């Protein structure tokens, strides 16, 4: 019996992405998720089995396809749920771009306090997405 698994270039960085997510989660004290185009491949700041391998929600796919970041500007606006079956909304999403192609996203999830991301939070998430994209190009 042969089982085919969809190839994910970002999946090759799985262990590396996991360490990066862990460090970001500790610095930001907020849950951080890293996804390839289809699934969560790394998480920190929450029980990993709660989110690993879960599918990217249509809202996340739209953000990635737009190649634009998403920032929760107004806590009263309707929330964006980035991962199917995960009940915390995203407060910041930055697509991971490698050689002009979208290969995933770094997601800052709402913490217990559901605060808006600070400017420093945004820059750290953006740096993570850019760094992972650059690693993909190597």
Predicted regions located by residue number:
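Short hydrophobic/glycine-rich mini-motifs in sensory/regulatory modules
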Residues: 96-106
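A short, flexible beta-alpha/helix-coil linker loop
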Residues: 2, 41, 110-114
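Flexible glycine-/small-residue-rich
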Residues: 6, 36, 110
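Structured interaction and signal-relay segments at domain junctions
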Residues: 19-86
């Amino acid at each position: 019996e042969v089982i085919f698994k969809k190839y994910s270039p970002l999946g090759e960085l799985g262990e590396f992405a996991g360490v990066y997510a862990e460090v970001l989660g500790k610095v930001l004290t907020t849950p951080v998720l890293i996804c390839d185009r289809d699934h969560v491949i790394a998480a920190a700041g929450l029980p990993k089995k709660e989110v690993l391998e879960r599918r990217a929600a249509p809202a996340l796919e739209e953000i990635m396809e737009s190649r634009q970041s998403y920032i929760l500007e107004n806590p009263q606006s309707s929330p964006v749920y980035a991962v199917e079956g995960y009940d915390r909304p995203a407060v910041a999403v930055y697509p991971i771009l490698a050689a002009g192609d979208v290969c995933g996203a770094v997601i800052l999830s709402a913490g217990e306090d559901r605060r808006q991301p600070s400017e420093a939070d945004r820059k750290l998430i953006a740096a993570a997405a850019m760094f992972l994209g650059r690693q993909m190009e190597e």
